[in-house]
């Protein structure tokens, strides 16, 4: 069995750009421009945190976005992905658990939220069994280009 660790990335490292780009290719069919500058924007921002799951190589990641509003601090989980070669081993759950522990330890009180496509059956089951509850609301987006 492989050893895995989850690391909160504090400094941008060129060596992470390729593996993150690879994971993004498995997460979305949308073309994503990801380079060192994009990594810098994430890890140097006080409003986001990037967690990397490593074995012998980078095998997964998760990002959280943090903001405050009049109704309290909100934390959004984004871009959760485990490389397809390592799925089915509970590694997505490890990433989610790490994000939850980080929020409890560093950001509480806060509300941790995420969205998931209903077609992603395994991901939705992971979130429900991790303690997330469905929020009956519509999510809308508008791309500012």
Locate each region found by the language model:
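Conserved N-terminal entry element of GNAT/NAT acetyltransferase domains
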Residues: 1-14
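Alpha-helical elements of Rossmann-like donor-binding domains used by nucleotide-donor carbohydrate transfer enzymes
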Residues: 19-23, 38, 94, 98
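Active-site rim helix/loop that mediates acceptor-substrate recognition in acyltransferases
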Residues: 29-50
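Residue-level recognition of the GNAT/N-acetyltransferase active site
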Residues: 78, 83, 87, 117
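Conserved acetyl-CoA-binding loop-helix of GNAT-fold acetyltransferases
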Residues: 82, 88-101, 125, 129
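Conserved GNAT acetyl-CoA-binding A-motif
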Residues: 103-116
């Amino acid at each position: 069995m492989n050893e895995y660790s989850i690391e909160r990335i504090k400094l941008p490292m060129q060596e992470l750009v390729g593996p993150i780009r690879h994971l993004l290719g498995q997460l979305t069919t949308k073309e994503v421009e990801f380079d060192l500058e994009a990594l810098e924007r994430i890890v140097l921002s006080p409003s986001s945190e990037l967690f990397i799951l490593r074995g012998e190589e980078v095998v997964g990641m998760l990002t959280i976005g943090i903001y405050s509003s009049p109704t309290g601090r909100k934390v959004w989980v984004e871009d959760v992905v485990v490389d397809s070669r390592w799925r089915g081993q509970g590694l997505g759950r490890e990433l989610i658990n790490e994000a939850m522990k980080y929020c409890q330890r560093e950001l509480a009180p806060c509300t941790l939220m995420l969205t998931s496509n209903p077609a992603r059956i395994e991901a939705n089951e992971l979130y429900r069994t991790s303690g997330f509850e469905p929020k009956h609301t519509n999510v809308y987006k508008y791309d500012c280009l």
